[in-house]
Amino acid sequence: MSTTAQDVEALVHSDDPNHPANHICTLCAKFYTLGWVTGTGGGTSIRHEDKIYIAPSGVQKELMKPTDMFVMDFESKEYLRRPQVLKPSACTPLFMAAFERGAGCCIHTHSQWAVLVTLLVERDLGTEACFEIEEIEQIKGIPKGRGKQGNLGYYDRLRIPIIENTAHEEDLRESLEAAMERWPDSYAILVRRHGIYVWGDNVHKAKTQCESIDYILQLAVEMKKLGLPWTKS
């Protein structure tokens, strides 16, 4: 059967607030108030069954509408819906890397705390080090790892790998995938001088994990100001 224009538009029209096209708009409006998607930066993508919903590139994220969404077929990687006046997200290859590992939602922010932590780690530990912190209550909001049951505990150490930034977002995919392979239990990857990618099994988990991690990153910056260590060793 051929796909009609009506079928294509039906992909982004729903009264359900949890429909991916609606949900992305709601999330990005919230993320804007947190300073995560300032100045058209950042993005969010949701996998719903065999379809990937992606916020466009170069738009004010707090003003997006469901009709601004791109929709891609997960298997073929072809666009089912592509707004003519908007650009596909430069984050798409990075989002797909998360979805190919079972994620249901991936969030990319330009959080200042994420950027600052990558600089602090580089200054104090070098470019090969990851961010590590322990004995912080909010760590309990982060899963133990892919395929593992439950979340990290208070005495567990949270580790988030850091990759170097590139001139073009899509060029991050190779290093991001390499970090995913090296750190299979991580649900987040920091990008130096840029931001962070966080993903989860579903929208709820990705959102709460991103909130927990940003809280921890802000805390880490404030701890550094006070000369407090992130870990005991």
Swiss-Prot record:
Cofactor(s) this protein requires? Zn(2+)
For this record, an example GO cellular component is: cytoplasm
Q: What is its main location?
A: cytoplasm
Q: Which reaction does it catalyse?
A: 5-(methylsulfanyl)-D-ribulose 1-phosphate = 5-methylsulfanyl-2,3-dioxopentyl phosphate + H2O
GO function terms (MF aspect):
methylthioribulose 1-phosphate dehydratase activity; zinc ion binding
One GO process term, biological-process aspect: L-methionine salvage from methylthioadenosine
Q: What does this protein do?
A: Catalyzes the dehydration of methylthioribulose-1-phosphate (MTRu-1-P) into 2,3-diketo-5-methylthiopentyl-1-phosphate (DK-MTP-1-P).
Cross-referenced HAMAP family: Salvage_MtnB_euk
Q: Which PANTHER family match?
A: METHYLTHIORIBULOSE-1-PHOSPHATE DEHYDRATASE
Q: Protein name, please?
A: Methylthioribulose-1-phosphate dehydratase
